[in-house]
């Protein structure tokens, strides 16, 4: 999404030729290396993202150059497109995309500000989670599948007519992007005694709670679009 906006909206705003913009994405997912080469990922007639590196590869580059973040001066993120919300932060955890969407959907449908933005029913690393929310007099049924095995189980039930939902979130990696193939590897000594997926997800939710803006549609950069 960022790559597409960079090559279209940002290029137009800055008077740049999309061909002269190089977009590098740092991702927890190794599949992104394949996705950037897909023919449908070219909103401006050129690849939306030119280079995809994993978080583990970025860490190696940082160590290789000897970069010390503690010695760098504080700076604001670039503008435009430098602002983010709590909803964006939680995308990396299973259920995060669902929760971010619900925050916006509920306010859009009801026309009222949410008294509580946390949808905790869809959080957690369980294989399949279901929840029903009454929104503007309508029962909205949602489901979240963590990992492809659970996704198949959920979709088989839907295809068989056993259940139905208004919105389904599927995370290919169990626990979500925090458990992606490109993430820093954890030793067996740690994995055997610590739920790394849950620990990483907790950091995201903690960061979300500290954000001044926690809903996607309230991001000033998005509103300008």
Indicate residue ranges for each PLM-predicted region.
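Iron-sulfur-associated redox domains of electron-transfer enzymes in respiratory
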Residues: 1-225
């Amino acid at each position: 999404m960022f790559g597409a906006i960079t090559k279209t909206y940002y290029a137009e705003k800055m008077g740049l030729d999309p061909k002269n913009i190089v977009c590098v994405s740092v991702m927890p997912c190794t599949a992104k290396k394949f996705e950037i080469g897909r023919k449908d990922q070219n909103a401006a007639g050129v690849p939306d993202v030119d280079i995809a590196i994993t978080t583990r590869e970025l860490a190696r580059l940082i160590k290789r150059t000897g970069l010390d973040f503690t010695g760098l001066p504080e700076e604001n993120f670039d503008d435009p497109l430098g602002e983010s919300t709590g909803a964006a932060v939680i995308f990396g955890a299973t259920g995060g995309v669902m929760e971010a969407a619900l925050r916006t959907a509920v306010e859009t449908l009801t026309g009222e500000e949410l008294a509580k933005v946390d949808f905790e029913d869809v959080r957690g690393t369980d294989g399949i989670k279901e929840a029903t929310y009454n929104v503007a007099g309508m029962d909205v049924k949602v489901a979240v599948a963590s990992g492809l095995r659970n996704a198949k189980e959920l979709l088989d039930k839907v295809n068989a007519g056993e259940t139905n939902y208004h919105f389904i979130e599927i995370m290919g990696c169990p626990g979500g992007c925090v458990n992606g193939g490109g993430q820093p590897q954890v030793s067996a000594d740690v994995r055997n005694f610590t739920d790394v997926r849950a620990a990483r997800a907790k950091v995201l939710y903690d960061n979300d709670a500290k954000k001044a803006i926690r809903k996607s549609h309230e991001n000033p950069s998005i509103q300008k679009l």
